[in-house]
């Protein structure tokens, strides 16, 4: 079973429909015990990192996420679900995040229109997550903040919006994307299908490059 964490994020129904479309064996969960028992975990999200972290802490999900990632359970973070993996966020003040990947969530430069809303191309590294997806394929973004990290090896996909920023990251069993695959048409569904296949067949190696 793939646990999809429900903490009140607005994009949950879209994420669920997309995962069901690619025939993922999902269960929407609010109980940390269900996350700990899952074969894989998805954290969708929209909104602010501070609000998301507050909700996760109140539910006891922050510790559950750390535990399952530490023991190798495949994990997919979407949009804010990617951002909360960072060490900290500068959104509405400095806030501590899960600290599972190196970096800080920072706002786009003041001269840019934010949030970035719409389609943008992703240059990817051709790893297994991107199998069958052309380099430069467009995905749907809605965000004002991005992951700033010095860990180049962490990044599997990049996008230009005022600067070159990480659109996707992967390490060991962690995979995360800044865009919304559930709103990104055929390539978003292809990416979700790839992740589901990797998560169910390769276990803790899902985030590895291939």
Swiss-Prot record:
It holds the Pfam family GATase. One of its GO terms (molecular function) is imidazoleglycerol-phosphate synthase activity. Its main location: cytoplasm. GO terms for cellular component: cytoplasm. The active site is at 79 (nucleophile), 180, 182. Coiled coil: none annotated. NCBIfam families: IMP_synth_hisH. This is Imidazole glycerol phosphate synthase subunit HisH. It comes from Herpetosiphon aurantiacus (strain ATCC 23779 / DSM 785 / 114-95). The lineage of its organism: Bacteria, Bacillati, Chloroflexota, Chloroflexia, Herpetosiphonales. The gene is hisH.
């Amino acid at each position: 079973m793939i646990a999809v964490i429900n903490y009140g994020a607005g994009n949950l129904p879209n994420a669920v429909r997309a995962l069901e479309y690619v025939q993922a064996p999902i269960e929407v969960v609010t109980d940390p015990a269900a996350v700990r028992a899952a074969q894989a975990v998805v954290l969708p999200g929209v909104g602010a990192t501070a609000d998301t972290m507050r909700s996760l802490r109140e539910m006891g999900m922050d510790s559950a996420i750390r535990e399952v990632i530490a023991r190798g359970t495949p994990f997919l973070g979407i949009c804010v679900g990617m951002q909360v993996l960072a060490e900290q966020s500068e959104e509405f003040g400095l806030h501590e995040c899960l600290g599972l990947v190196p970096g800080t969530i920072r706002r786009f430069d003041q001269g840019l229109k934010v949030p970035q809303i719409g389609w943008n191309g992703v240059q990817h590294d051709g790893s297994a997550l991107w199998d069958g997806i052309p380099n430069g394929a467009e995905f749907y973004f809605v965000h004002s903040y991005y992951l700033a990290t010095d860990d180049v090896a962490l990044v599997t996909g990049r996008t230009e919006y005022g600067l070159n920023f990480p659109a996707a990251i992967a390490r060991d069993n962690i995979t995360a994307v800044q865009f919304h695959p559930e709103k990104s048409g055929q390539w978003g569904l292809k990416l979700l299908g790839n992740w589901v296949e990797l998560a169910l067949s390769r276990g803790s190696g899902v985030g590895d490059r291939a």
